[in-house]
Amino acid sequence: MALPLSGTRHLTRALLSNVTLMAPPRIPSSVHYGGSRLGCSTRFFSIRCGANRSGSTYSPLNSGSNFSDRPPTEMAPLFPGCDYEHWLIVMDKPGGEGATKQQMIDCYIQTLAKVVGSEEEAKKRIYNVSCERYLGFGCEIDEETSTKLEGLPGVLFVLPDSYVDPENKDYGAELFVNGEIVQRSPERQRRVEPQPQRAQDRPRYNDRTRYSRRRENTR
């Protein structure tokens, strides 16, 4: 069954938290990439569904999907923070090869400024930035404005955002307020950081399987 547009936001963030997007990843047919927007099903392995064809665009306001026909207020209880006013913009090599963190952030600001009118306005609208686990930023804009980001140099994905920490209405990454990075309290920071996989959560083989494999390796 297809997932709602925002349904794979958490899958996307999990993937991004483990991969630095220095080059475009292998993209399945369901993402909006390099200027064409995702359909409404899944992200990365269903990043927002529908087939992605060159030049096609998607809007949750005009999609025929049963999920995307639901207004944001209906989707919010399932994916807190997904209101189509907060967007995650993932970029490829912001600031160029070997850019410093500040150069990346400057690139984020300059990119958003192209659709909101000025760098000062862009600084007000960017609420988080990421320069390590993935390369991109979160910004508060309406859906129509978000479509204008598609196809801009360096923009890989334009994705509806959702909370990493719903209790504090926090979208994760590094907080960005009026052009400056703001530190969270240690407690809040722990809530948005990716948690290391626990040993008991890792897949394990039973003793018979391990014994069988040891025998095969000795042949």
UniProtKB/Swiss-Prot annotation:
Residues 1-48 form a transit peptide. Disulfide bonds: none annotated. Residues 182-219 are annotated as: Disordered. InterPro entries: MORF/ORRM1/DAG-like, MORF/ORRM1/DAG-like_MORF, S8pro/Inhibitor_I9_sf. This is Multiple organellar RNA editing factor 2, chloroplastic. It holds the Pfam family MORF_dom. GO terms for cellular component: chloroplast; endoplasmic reticulum; mitochondrion. Homodimer and heterodimer with MORF9. Interacts with protoporphyrinogen oxidase 1 PPOX1. Heterodimers with MORF8/RIP1 and MORF9/RIP9. Interacts with PCMP-A2/PMD1. Interacts with ORRM1. Interacts with ORRM6. Keywords: Chloroplast, mRNA processing, Plastid, Transit peptide. Involved in plastid rRNA processing and consequently in translation and early chloroplast differentiation. Involved in organellar RNA editing. Required for the processing of multiple editing sites in plastids. One of its GO terms (biological process) is plastid organization. Belongs to the MORF family. The gene is MORF2. Disruption phenotype: Small plants with white leaves that do not contain chlorophyll. Mutant plants are unable to grow autotrophically on soil and flowers are sterile. Residues 185-219 have a biased composition (Basic and acidic residues). One of its GO terms (molecular function) is protein dimerization activity. Gene3D superfamilies: Peptidase S8 propeptide/proteinase inhibitor I9. It is found in: Plastid, Chloroplast.
